[in-house]
Amino acid sequence: MIKNYIKTAWRNLVINKVTSLISVAGLAVGIGCFILLATYLLNELRYDRFHVNANRIMRVAYNYKSSDDAEAKSVAVTPTAPVPVFKQQLQEIEDGVRISWYNNPVQYQDKLFNEKRFFLADEPFFRIFSFKFLRGNAATALKDPSALVITASTAKKYFGTEDAIGKVLKVNNKLNMMVTGVVEDVPEYSQIKFDIIGSSAGSEHAKTRKWDSANDYSYLLLRPGVNINSVEQKMNNYVAEMFKDDFRQGHKMWFKLEPLTDVHLKSQATYPLTPSGNIRYIYVLGAVAIILLLLACVNFLNLVTAKAIERGHEIGVRKVMGAARSQLFTQFIIESAMITLVSLLAGLFLADVSFKWFSDFSGQQLGFQTWNTSWLIMAMVALFVTVTFLAGTYPSLYLSAFNPIVTLKGKLTNTSGGRALRKSLVIFQFVVSVFFMICTVIAGSQLRYIQHLNIGINRSQVMVIDVGGKSLKDIKSFNNEVTQLPGVLYATASYDSPVDVHGGYSINHADGKNSDYNLSVTALPVEKNFLNTLGLKLVQGINFTDADEKHSTDADENKRYYGFIINEKAAKALGWTAEEAIGKHIGLNGRTGEVRGVVQNFNFASLHQEITPIVMFTEDYFGKVLIKTSGNNIAKTISAVKEKWSAFNPATPFEYHFLDQEFDDMYKAEQRTGSILTAFTLVTIFISCLGLFGLAVFSTRQRVKEVGVRKVLGASVFSIVKLVSGDFLKLVIISVIIASPIAWYAMHRWLLDFAYKISIQIWVFIAAGAVAILIAFITVSVQSLKAALTNPVKSLRSGD
């Protein structure tokens, strides 16, 4: 019996080629897109879950607020004290580890690389995190102060096929460190991404227990069954008691325990170890995946029910011949299952050939290998059953319920209920399409606005070179030579790249303020040409001078006196105008000096946040050189700078990037989501138009005789096209009216995440509506024009 059902179903699919092809095409595209998005979402959601103790590992976020801060700050970095202190104080904590950046040039024989993913970590690192060892012992790998653990790719880079264990690498041209372990390359879905982990046992920094100067990434391993909130409360009670005098004065700090598996998508802390995702974008893309699948199913459902009238005679004959409703239901479900199976296979093929494109698009390495094989099989079976049920159940019930007498008499017509359902489904499809069109345009406009917004910094054509930590004397020597090169306008230096500037500084003394005054600020040690190089505009006062550099680098720390340049936001937070700020004395984390100048507000950080108070001062130690180029013959300029660098510091590889790239990287999550949304907006339009075209085919077939009569009576081609297309265009207009307020609300909420944002313009809704109507008109007109141009005699004959 089943074999007969399958043969009959296949014959019907072949006979009804148009319906079958449109159904398969729509379902295949919908399923393929669903698989692509599901794979992307799986990759995002599995971050850090490969660790054996993932559910017990907590990242410590550091929160602080002074009495004069408008709001609290939350950062992913902590001082050195929390991990060793809380391990000792709280029995609920089984272990803990601190990680700190240690980017330095590393050399083995004639191989020299500037390692960007080099960290120092406490000994328990590999006991807490489950990175798989290929060589060495995880329990003791970081016990020795000079120990290094490297990834398999790093081992191959330095040693080829030789055994890496016991090999000695020279770090920063002075420190010998021995390889004690080799681990598998870190998975892409790990927020701790490293190439080299060194022992921090020999670091003076790691031996300290400071509660200020946050630079470490801290993780705690809780004992099984421990309540996270209880541990967090005990930690914060301890801190409140230790610093009760500071708390009375309004300066507070507290810690938040963030489950490791939540860090990538849910953490709000700034300065993460690696760029974070956003759980809201996961929800959005998850909804897009489901909606695309629903659109494809709706398409199929619409086409089958519309086609039902043409199958009425077949159903009537089979019922008269004794076919039960259950048998007809089974027949139609098998037809749906066959279309779903073909569509699923086609969708898998489309997904497979699209993975490379989608990987480039999304910035992740995606493919069927992302899935566990058994998971993939179960997912595809579930998808097959779900789509068959969604797309096949109603049409099967609908078709098998036809009255055989009515169908055999040829009196089966479109019922009002059937028409209403099909209209509702068309409206649903175009509501989705118009909604995505509006959202895509607004999101794109916001991202373009951010990219071109004047943030007070001239970031264009600024090279950033990682110098690995150099004195002011060395920096000035190099910069003096570089500025003589054609194509170089200015050169300066800073402790960090402007984009990586951390908070954690406080102005704890200022003229005219109480002794307990404390204002949290962002601070940046810079070389005196920093303002000129980045085009920062002085609104009051003077730039740094040679005297400032001399005073701030005095060998006797007690004699150091700093010149400070602050931004307008800092002056306002201090209660001063720009004019009043000049000459005022302030204290910054133990540094004392006076305000030399006030610059126009500028933004180093993401435009999700407001501009913060910023303080700049000269110092004697720098990690980055910034070179402003003219932009003319940039390749030649880079080559010349590289030549100077090689002569100046042959022990450190020349590596550079451009500052505007760093700024763009801050919005990768938004750009990625926007790009994905744009691509799948086009897919929703395609699926909607595919369904609309199929319905137009059936609609014109039902109105063949009417069209013929109208032509005989003198109707023009335009009037017939208008007649056939009009009903569909009304549905699209209704869709625009429904989608517009929903899209406005969604994008209004999204824009609230940005401190600097566009206003939503009415033209976006008008343009999206016009595009949707135009696309629908073109889609339907292809078929209605064909009907209008058909010989009326032929139309009247076919209508008999």
Model-found features: residue ranges?
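Intracellular coupling helices
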Residues: 6-22, 26, 296-339, 401-412, ...
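Membrane-helix entry/capping segments
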Residues: 3-11, 15, 19, 51, ...
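Hydrophobic, regular-secondary-structure patches
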Residues: 44, 58-114, 124, 156-161, ...
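Alpha-helical transmembrane segments
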Residues: 29-58, 354-363, 432-460, 750-757
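Mid-to-C-terminal secondary-structure elements
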Residues: 122-135, 148-277, 477-669
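Small-residue-rich transmembrane alpha-helices
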Residues: 32, 36, 256, 337-404, ...
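Membrane-proximal juxtamembrane linkers immediately C-terminal to transmembrane helices
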Residues: 35, 42-65, 92, 132, ...
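Hydrophobic alpha-helical transmembrane segments of multi-pass inner-membrane transport and secretion
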Residues: 15-41, 277-313, 341, 421-446, ...
